Amino acid sequence: MELLTFRDVAIEFSPEEWKCLDPDQQNLYRDVMLENYRNLVSLGVAISNPDLVTCLEQRKEPYNVKIHKIVARPPAMCSHFTQDHWPVQGIEDSFHKLILRRYEKCGHDNLQLRKGCKSLNECKLQKGGYNEFNECLSTTQSKILQCKASVKVVSKFSNSNKRKTRHTGEKHFKECGKSFQKFSHLTQHKVIHAGEKPYTCEECGKAFKWSLIFNEHKRIHTGEKPFTCEECGSIFTTSSHFAKHKIIHTGEKPYKCEECGKAFNRFTTLTKHKRIHAGEKPITCEECRKIFTSSSNFAKHKRIHTGEKPYKCEECGKAFNRSTTLTKHKRIHTGEKPYTCEECGKAFRQSSKLNEHKKVHTGERPYKCDECGKAFGRSRVLNEHKKIHTGEKPYKCEECGKAFRRSTDRSQHKKIHSADKPYKCKECDKAFKQFSLLSQHKKIHTVDKPYKCKDCDKAFKRFSHLNKHKKIHT
């Protein structure tokens, strides 16, 4: 049996080439080489050059060990056996399966594989690939196509303005014929056709196709917001939202209209703008004259006027005109409160309610009434307050004709006319017509007093009680 060396099973780099690989690719190289070594030893093949094996096991740079003089070839990652150096029957298949398994498992973006080769120059695991003139191709010049039997690489190149293609017999992905440069992208794409959603949220049961989107979704339940803006301190759940936000501070407008040259900081804004050039007219609501650029948004808006409420709660039968509103409503029944105040530990069902609550601790009241100078922490409360000065009561009860300044007051009033008490206390089974009354009632069972007076440190269960108390100090 001929003695094998690591020159015969060679993956070779210069120091400069090694530095071009990212850590994942370096780790893949080490793992493949060591597994090759172990497989050969297990088959009784004598292996020379133990220094390289030791170097790999200690995770040192492989170019520190002199395997042999580096041959003059383009900078690439090459792994090969020659036809003459297969000492044991079946080891060739074993080698191919090993590399293919490693490749498919790790899904490294810019490593490409060819199978079924018989000579030294035919079988390569490489970056980008070579053409038939042994010229190195960039990864953008290669496409991984899905064949029914195996994964193959087609390397396309140009020479003297002639287009040539290697490795015939390839088959595109049969579902749609789409091809990909990256094996991981192909794997992800196939999920679309399969309709598969393997990632299911244990909290709400929602399923996702991609692990990345699933992980971002889980942060809704945990309240985690790992992305913080250094400019303004805003925090975000997803990296995509954070990236969009940063453009506000930089003034960057990366999305440019090819028709007129106008630039935008968001792709969605560019899409809306393009409708002007396409001759698409904005949609105007005949009821309130509000203008919409999206037909889907207009369809949602029309439900306000028609009273259509297609999203119904299975627990209590209450219906809503938006799916997001139904999702928020369901938390009443589940008791879920994913948004927690870091100051006092109070939890909320909606992030907007948490943001409003935070102003209790900061004392911030940015919204001021021009009529009386009174300030408010929420713009909505200011708008409702203004109706005191105007005397406006736009919300009228259809049952008795009584009018109200706020729609919430009318909604609460309408429950007088019905015997329905949908809000039930889990502690004592007492039921209430209004959710606010249930919230007040629940404080009987707890000692929670979140509203604290800054002047005397006295605490109260209700914010209204704190306001009454403050008058003592003034």
From Swiss-Prot:
Keywords: Developmental protein, Disease variant, DNA-binding, Metal-binding, Nucleus, Repeat, Repressor, Transcription, Transcription regulation, Zinc, Zinc-finger. GO terms for biological process: anatomical structure morphogenesis; limb morphogenesis; negative regulation of transcription by RNA polymerase II; regulation of DNA-templated transcription; transcription by RNA polymerase II. It is found in: Nucleus. The keyword Cytoplasm does not apply. InterPro entries: KRAB (IPR001909), KRAB_dom_sf (IPR036051), Znf_C2H2_sf (IPR036236), Znf_C2H2_type (IPR013087). One of its GO terms (cellular component) is nucleus. May be involved in transcriptional regulation as a repressor. Plays a role in limb development. Belongs to the krueppel C2H2-type zinc-finger protein family. This is Zinc finger protein 141.
